[in-house]
Design a protein with these regions (language model features):
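A bilobed periplasmic-binding-protein/Venus flytrap-type ligand-binding module shared by bacterial periplasmic
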Residues: 78-89, 191-204
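Short amphipathic alpha-helical coupling segments at ligand-binding clamshell hinges
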Residues: 94, 202-213
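Beta->alpha turn/N-cap motifs
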Residues: 6, 30-34, 44, 48-58, ...
Length: 235
């Protein structure tokens, strides 16, 4: 099963223990970027991928001409603003440097969050397809830097704001309560992580057993104890 490092790997590893009790052996394969897992899934090197939200999967399918499918909802983990220097949107200085993910849907997602915070205005109706070229108002003259998502936590020491997906927050040892100050709503569509598979195996016994194992009471309890509200089960 393909996952990105951090909480997704931890949760899938726990789900693998439950799956083993149900007769299914799961090999957990960790990746450090957002594109390789879906590529490996589409190529048949993986059976499932657990790390992305639905808009990211749709973008991948569109760009790569693939037909990966959502087989279940996984966990909820909102993106947020992180900083060592400031603790509120009001404290963001003019000319602040802000880092966002450089992959298409999470970059757009970060720009939408900056807009929600009142720091930017974007071209209308762009959604997660928004890019820095769609910024139509930038009242604080923010300098937006696009970085690999896994590198964003390192930028917290050097920049005023980093807009970071929760899995990389946790894997870097940051905490929402200690280092963050503005977040997506828990109900935001981009906060919901899904389990993806190929069309040829969505109905397979292997996939069904893994999904049932992942969405089990044991895994829900593990998530609650381990992540203390930063990540929540969707079931």
């Amino acid at each position: 099963r393909g996952v990105t490092a951090g909480p997704h790997a931890d949760i899938v590893t726990e789900a693998a223990k439950v799956a083993k009790e149900r007769g299914l052996t799961v090999e957990v394969v960790e990746f450090t970027d957002y594109v390789t897992p879906d590529t490996a899934l589409a190529d048949g090197k993986l059976d499932l991928a657990v790390y992305q939200h639905r808009p990211f999967l749709e973008n991948f399918n569109s760009k790569q001409n693939t037909d990966l499918r959502v087989v279940a909802d996984a966990v909820i983990q909102p993106m947020g603003f992180y900083s060592r220097r400031i603790k509120s949107v009001d404290a963001v200085p003019e000319g602040a440097r802000g880092a966002i993910p450089n992959d298409p849907s999470n970059g757009g997602r970060a720009l939408l969050l900056l807009e929600k915070a009142g720091l930017l205005v974007l071209e209308k109706n762009r959604g997660t397809e928004a890019t820095v070229a769609d910024i139509v108002e930038n009242p604080k003259k923010l300098n937006i830097l696009e970085l690999e998502a896994a590198q964003l936590p390192r930028s917290v020491d050097d920049l005023e704001i980093a807009v970071i997906p929760m899995n990389y927050v946790i894997s870097a040892g940051l905490t929402p309560e200690g280092d963050g100050f503005f977040f997506e709503d828990m109900q935001a569509p981009y906060a919901l992580i899904i389990i993806a598979s190929r069309p040829d195996n969505t109905e397979s016994a292997t996939v069904k057993t893994f999904v049932e194992s992942y969405r089990s009471p044991q895994v829900a309890e593990f998530i609650g104890k381990t992540f203390r509200g930063a990540v929540k089960p969707s079931w």
